[in-house]
Amino acid sequence: MQKLTFTFIVSLILTLGAAGQKISISLFNNLKLSTVLITPTSGSYRLILGDNEVELKVNQILYISRSGDSLMVRDANQNMGTWKRVTVVGQTGEDIIRVKPIVPASPARLYDDNLSFYVDLDRIFAINLIDQEKYVAAVVEAEGGLNREPEFYKVQALIVRTYTFAHLNKHLAEGFNLCDEVHCQSYLGRSEKNSDILDAVLDTKDMVIVDAERNPITAAFHANCGGQTANSEDVWVKPLPYLVSVSDRYCLGSNSSTWERSIPIGEWKKFLSQYGVDTLKIKKNSDLDFQAKTRPKYYAVMGVEIPTTDIRKHFRLRSAWFSVSAGKSEVRLSGRGYGHGVGLCQDGAINMAQKGWTYDQIVQYYYKGVSIVKLTELDMDRIRVDTTLNNMVEPNLPPPGMEFPQRPPDR
């Protein structure tokens, strides 16, 4: 696969700690782009086509279309030729550009800083080369929601920056650092809806969360833990000393803290039989009942233990913490929490911030034995990044409907 060839790409691959560091993000990564429309909306841009440079005016429309393994460029007045790479470079540091996929069609988004386009794998790749702190702010806005306390945004900024630093080379073989899908981090364009977010990012500039060995942590988080977070090994097999279960009363007032679900009893029994439960020996439906006063690892029925995480995945439940009450024709699940339950509980952290907790107090409550440090304090040559829990992103779940109507999957 082609690699980005700008000379300034080399330094960003080596370290995230330098001032003004840029990182490269593949945009609309889930789409097989063949035509995009770009429009500068603020600042000043230069369009680079081979050895030629052209000034792009604010609101000037530019079409970029795939033509074989090259890109055809045109504006409203003329065809500007066919090129292997099209680069758009901001000149002021406060440059904003609109990107609108035409084929396939998708809503437009606004992005900061620079863009590069090239063809590979029979599609256009659109790469945003962006200042790392602007990127962090954009992800905080996408994953943390709006109208939150500044201390909560600082917590989210630390989580996002820690993940970014730990996974900087995730897509390096494909020619960029990260993509905009949730398996990297949800990136829906520039942060512009709440100035508190950018302030929080700048207040925590270059800070990350590290474990006792000063390695970046797996900064897992979820929407609501239901009153108790989960041990990492109960969800992802591997134990991590900072991802341990903690009691959390701060999320219990949230609408996401409890849920209900009814499942036809025949469907429930069919699922149980896949785990070796002899459903013919069930004499009465109440034999299926199960009470979970604390977060359970298994659902025990007829001498068989079934991982609650398996049940959650199969039935697409909001969490793996639930009790079971069987009636004549259906089983009723009464659940707690929303998400995998490991690490930071967003609803709990939001409430803590409202009650006056500081960002470092919140971080150290949910992640045990960690420290918050500047990237410049770390020994880049000895840092070890644990990638064994990379596949933490869950399938899309039913929307909780109240406080976070479009919450991203847990990370």
Model-derived features: positions:
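Conserved, single-site charged/polar hotspot
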Residues: 5-12, 17-411
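N-terminal secretory signal peptides that target proteins for export/translocation
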Residues: 1-2
